[in-house]
Amino acid sequence: MTQQAKEPKFIKNGIYRKDAVPVRDKKPEWLKVTIPTGQVYGEVRKIVKEHRLHTVCEEAMCPNIGECWSRGTATFMLMGHICTRACRFCAVDTGNPMGKLDLEEPAHVAESVRLMGLKYVVLTSVDRDDLPDGGAYHFAKTVTAIKRENPGTRVEALTPDFGGNPHCVDLVLESGVDVYAQNLETVRRLTHPVRDIRASYERTLGVLKHAKQSRPDVITKTSIMLGLGETREELREAMLDCRAHGVDVITFGQYLRPTMHHLPVERYVSPAEFDEIREEGLSLGFLEVVAGPLVRSSYKAEQIVMDKPGNLPEHLAHLEGKEQLSLI
């Protein structure tokens, strides 16, 4: 009698339904988005489905999916749809993937990039604590495949923390990435109410510091959500911590509750306050600060071109004039 292979079990949207907080907030006007439509949107969706790919746009219920897909851009989410962690802000499924990997994924992603004609690609992934290297080799292999099939295409890697293992970080850095990102997500005080207990404020900063020290020529980047109960003083502390750890670019966006079973929104931050935060960040020396209600780590990643000749720091001077090299 043939024994059937066990299928991974997971929790849909990453949160048990018993954790529901029955609060329905009316979103302000500035957070309203259009319904996804259009020929380009349909073509991107078709390519993603045909190549059995996952995108963070879909899995994380991103509000910008219509705008980004209609522009022919997407953020690819590697290593499946099941994350081994359960952050309380995130809609990605959580569970045990049982070591399963699609070994054809790097080639499929590279081909999709070619079919879409992308000049700038953002790669992210679920956490894979079930794998000895956290998926670092698979991540690096995907970057290499993209670069091989799409010469001139720039790649941003938004990685897991790999348990803080510097050798795993180096695997990705040595694959040819142009931007290395790891998200802080929130301020120090709120880290464990917001992120999985295995995540760490200090570890994320350590990963970013190691990335900058190992590859000074690679742009380092992080992202923080607002509206979870943080204060402006705590935000400034987080920005100072990022600068002290060599972070070049930081983004700020409004936290939006993906389901009723996730953390509630404490407040909606106005566009004017986002503008103030951007100016404060620039005054602290960031190469770029992107802040706005609908800003996400990879939002409009391909459109913010480095057009600051003569103003780049020495360690990034080689990037001047590079077409379509984005800061976020």
Curated annotation (Swiss-Prot):
EC number: 2.8.1.8
Coiled coil, from the record: none
Keyword Cytoplasm: yes
Cofactor(s) of this protein: [4Fe-4S] cluster
The protein's name in its UniProt record: Lipoyl synthase
Catalysed reactions listed for this entry: [[Fe-S] cluster scaffold protein carrying a second [4Fe-4S](2+) cluster] + N(6)-octanoyl-L-lysyl-[protein] + 2 oxidized [2Fe-2S]-[ferredoxin] + 2 S-adenosyl-L-methionine + 4 H(+) = [[Fe-S] cluster scaffold protein] + N(6)-[(R)-dihydrolipoyl]-L-lysyl-[protein] + 4 Fe(3+) + 2 hydrogen sulfide + 2 5'-deoxyadenosine + 2 L-methionine + 2 reduced [2Fe-2S]-[ferredoxin]
Family: Belongs to the radical SAM superfamily. Lipoyl synthase family.
Positions that bind [4Fe-4S] cluster 2: 83, 87, 90
Domain Radical SAM core: 69-287
Gene: lipA
InterPro entries: Aldolase_TIM, Elp3/MiaA/NifB-like_rSAM, LIAS_N, Lipoyl_synth, rSAM
